[in-house]
């Protein structure tokens, strides 16, 4: 085995360990924020939605700058600093008794993610060969699902005693992850050339094909982020206990671990990436439309199963498609900008979803937010269909800029 092949192989194992620590640290805390502050402390869902939206907007919206800085200075210092900032955000969240403290903690957590997320994504593109990326993204997502369940189980158990223990566990995991990266991550450069920050930013912004794709995904993410806000609240409301939320993540893990990789392997040989993304989005949309009209936990979990099936169809294709459109001369900048759709979609999905949930509850129309999200899913599906239509591909709109 050549030194390059050996480095790629060891790098992939490093990425898997790193990813598990990050996923555990995140899911110990974030799925329980809505339970803690809406159900236990009686805050309006809008207040919590704003907090979650701020974290999403800061982390993903500023990701292009984090990626551009990583292109210039390398991955390691950005990742270690960002993970320590995320731990600090969790520490602040532990003492949040006013909305502004929760907002501050989420902003700090988001700033940490701004620093570590784009270089981590760029390392995947650097270390995994193009023909292997779809399968590797599938493995990462299976790991995400397993980590989500373990994290949510740990967080739910700790929440019975004290929310401060939940935040402490999350902070400890991110500190451990920072130490792991500081000790084991080589001083790798992300791009094929040492790209100045301004040049990396400009290269992305001139790529009309990539910019259009990223912004189109805003609607997709408005649906996807509800696993952190409205779905846990719905499960808790119908079940009458926050302990039921862990079963939602158990469903996700079961579906992901049993179906994600086989579906990805089967579909990558038969369908184009954009068609897989659109098919998954359509399934997610159909699952969301009737959620507000469900009255039993069995019905709700059935729809959640369908939603997760759509997600595992779409997610590997979305990640692989984004990576395939990136320019190797500015990987960090591209991976940072690719998070902008999640920034906008997350902020709108959290804040808008929280507001719609409160408004629907106040007027006795609990189905309102879910119907609105379903409409957004349909619009996004049509936008993707338009973007990847044969006529637009033939016109050069989807061709790389030179």
Curated annotation (Swiss-Prot):
PROSITE patterns: MFS
Keywords recorded for this protein, A-Z: Cell inner membrane, Cell membrane, Membrane, Transmembrane, Transmembrane helix, Transport
GO terms of molecular function: transmembrane transporter activity
Signal peptide feature range: none
GO cellular component: plasma membrane
CDD domains: MFS_MdtH_MDR_like
Domain of life: Bacteria
Membrane topology according to the record: Multi-pass membrane protein
Major location category of this protein: membrane
Subcellular localization: Cell inner membrane
Family annotation (NCBIfam families): PRK11646.1
Family membership noted in the UniProt record: Belongs to the major facilitator superfamily. DHA1 family. MdtH (TC 2.A.1.2.21) subfamily.
Protein name: Multidrug resistance protein MdtH
Originating species: Klebsiella pneumoniae subsp. pneumoniae (strain ATCC 700721 / MGH 78578)
Gene name, Swiss-Prot/TrEMBL: mdtH
């Amino acid at each position: 085995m050549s030194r390059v092949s050996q480095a790629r192989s060891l790098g992939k194992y490093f990425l898997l360990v790193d990813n598990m620590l990050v996923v555990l640290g995140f899911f110990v805390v974030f799925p329980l924020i809505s339970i803690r502050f809406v159900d236990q402390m009686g805050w309006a869902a809008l207040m919590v939605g704003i907090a979650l939206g701020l974290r999403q907007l800061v982390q993903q919206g500023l990701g292009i700058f984090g990626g551009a800085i990583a292109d210039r200075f390398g991955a390691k210092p950005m990742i270690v600093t960002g993970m320590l900032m995320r731990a600090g955000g969790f520490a602040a969240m532990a003492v949040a008794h006013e909305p502004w403290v929760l907002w501050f903690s989420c902003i700090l957590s988001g700033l940490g993610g701004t620093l570590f997320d784009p270089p981590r994504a760029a390392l995947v593109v650097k270390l995994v060969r193009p023909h292997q990326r779809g399968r590797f993204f599938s493995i990462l997502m299976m790991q995400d699902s397993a980590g989500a369940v373990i994290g949510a189980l740990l967080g739910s158990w700790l929440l019975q005693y004290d929310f401060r223990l939940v935040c402490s566990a999350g902070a400890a995991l991110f500190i451990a992850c920072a130490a792991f990266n500081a000790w084991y991550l080589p001083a790798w450069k992300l791009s094929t050339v040492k790209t100045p920050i301004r040049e990396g930013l400009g290269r992305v912004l001139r790529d009309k094909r990539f910019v259009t794709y990223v912004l189109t995904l805003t609607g997709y993410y408005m649906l996807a982020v509800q696993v952190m806000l409205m779905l846990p609240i719905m499960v808790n409301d119908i079940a009458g206990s926050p302990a039921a939320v862990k079963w939602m993540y158990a469903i996700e893990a079961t579906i992901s671990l049993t179906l994600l990789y086989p579906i990805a392997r089967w579909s990558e040989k038969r369908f184009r990436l954009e068609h897989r993304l659109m098919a998954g989005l359509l399934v997610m949309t159909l699952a969301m439309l009737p959620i507000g009209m469900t009255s039993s936990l069995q019905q709700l979990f059935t729809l959640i199963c369908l939603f997760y099936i759509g997600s595992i169809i779409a997610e590997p294709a979305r990640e692989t498609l984004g990576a395939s459109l990136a320019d190797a001369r500015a990987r960090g900048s591209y991976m940072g900008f690719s998070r902008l759709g999640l920034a906008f979609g997350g902020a709108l999905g959290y804040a808008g979803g929280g507001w719609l949930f409160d408004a629907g509850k106040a007027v006795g129309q609990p189905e309102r937010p879910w119907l609105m999200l379903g409409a957004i899913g349909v619009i996004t599906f049509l936008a993707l269909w338009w973007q990847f239509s044969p006529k637009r591909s033939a016109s050069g709109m989807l061709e790389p800029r030179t």
